[in-house]
């Protein structure tokens, strides 16, 4: 009798993706983040579903409905904080996953990489709209400031902003449509993630050495299922430490004040995971230039494969590029810090220097260092 794993049409798909999948024998813990992102997505959909049962997307009742969830709904507080902090864990895993792709040259799988960039944009859009839903001060003003950036687009900008708002300001129509999009986007992300996996399994996984590993593969189960479960335990530990001990650590206190269009907070800023892009936006005095830099700070990932000059795929044996990569990581930490600071001296100058450094590393220095390393190895 044929094993059900190989004969049943549905079970066969699961088997070929998670059980009998041939995986390189040397992939490290950096390859855990793909599965962790899947777990984060499932967690966010489940907690979000339960929150949506009690939330009302109306400007008059949105804030009090979130309060009601935390105070009156059974375990509502833990569901709410798991959802809010789950988003932070999601982005930590995302940044690690993208960083691993850049370090080990996974961007040479062009279809997988490009769908990954689409996924990144979709997750960022979902997180932004989710931040608006509690209808606190930072929700309202964050929505106003970020959507207003689209008015920098020549000719159609103002009409586009009013079309997104559903009126002449951020109001009931905006909140309702943001809730609708925030609800549907995770399911679109799930579909995109399936396509991401489909293309990945066409080529097979990359590995730390960057070399073809077809001659040395092992089955995904039990070796990497056990390894992924360990990563999952760490993820749950970190999330629950955050949720149970300091649930508001990564949030903004201003969001506990109900939205008031007549009172602007002293310092409008997005959630921590957008601060690096926000710092790049603020570092350019021109509005359109800032918006372009903001979009390019993420879209630059699509250009990385075109700028790969090294004869080696991975940075594992390229010490110069390794130094540059960790400079880039330090630069992103600097940008994140600057994004949370007020717009005054010396933060403006530091932000501008960090922004120049960010684009210089990715567009100029990495290709140059790749060529230098080729010359040093006489290739």
From Swiss-Prot:
Location in or out of the cell: Mitochondrion inner membrane
Binding site for heme b b566: 97, 196
Protein keywords: Electron transport, Heme, Iron, Membrane, Metal-binding, Mitochondrion, Mitochondrion inner membrane, Respiratory chain, Transmembrane, Transmembrane helix, Transport, Ubiquinone
Cofactor remark: Binds 2 heme b groups non-covalently.
Gene Ontology terms: cellular component: mitochondrial inner membrane; respiratory chain complex III
Binding-site residues, a ubiquinone: 201
InterPro entries: Cyt_b/b6_C, Cyt_b/b6_C_sf, Cyt_b/b6_N, Cytb/b6-like_sf, Cytochrome_b, Cytochrome_b_C_euk/bac, Cytochrome_b_N_euk/bac, Di-haem_cyt_TM
Domain of life: Eukaryota
Pfam families noted in UniProt: Cytochrom_B_C, Cytochrome_B
Coiled-coil segments on the chain, per record: none
UniProt: heme b b562 binding residues: 83, 182
Sequence intervals crossing the membrane: 33-53, 77-98, 113-133, 178-198, 226-246, 288-308, 320-340, 347-367
Membrane topology: Multi-pass membrane protein
CDD domains hit by this protein: cytochrome_b_C (cd00290), Cytochrome_b_N (cd00284)
Keyword Membrane part of the UniProt annotation: yes
Any one GO MF annotation of this record: metal ion binding
Co-factor(s): heme b
GO BP: mitochondrial electron transport, ubiquinol to cytochrome c
Quaternary data: The cytochrome bc1 complex contains 11 subunits: 3 respiratory subunits (MT-CYB, CYC1 and UQCRFS1), 2 core proteins (UQCRC1 and UQCRC2) and 6 low-molecular weight proteins (UQCRH/QCR6, UQCRB/QCR7, UQCRQ/QCR8, UQCR10/QCR9, UQCR11/QCR10 and a cleavage product of UQCRFS1). This cytochrome bc1 complex then forms a dimer.
Note: Heme 1 (or BL or b562) is low-potential and absorbs at about 562 nm, and heme 2 (or BH or b566) is high-potential and absorbs at about 566 nm.
Function of the molecule: Component of the ubiquinol-cytochrome c reductase complex (complex III or cytochrome b-c1 complex) that is part of the mitochondrial respiratory chain. The b-c1 complex mediates electron transfer from ubiquinol to cytochrome c. Contributes to the generation of a proton gradient across the mitochondrial membrane that is then used for ATP synthesis.
Family (UniProt): Belongs to the cytochrome b family.
Name of this chain's protein: Cytochrome b
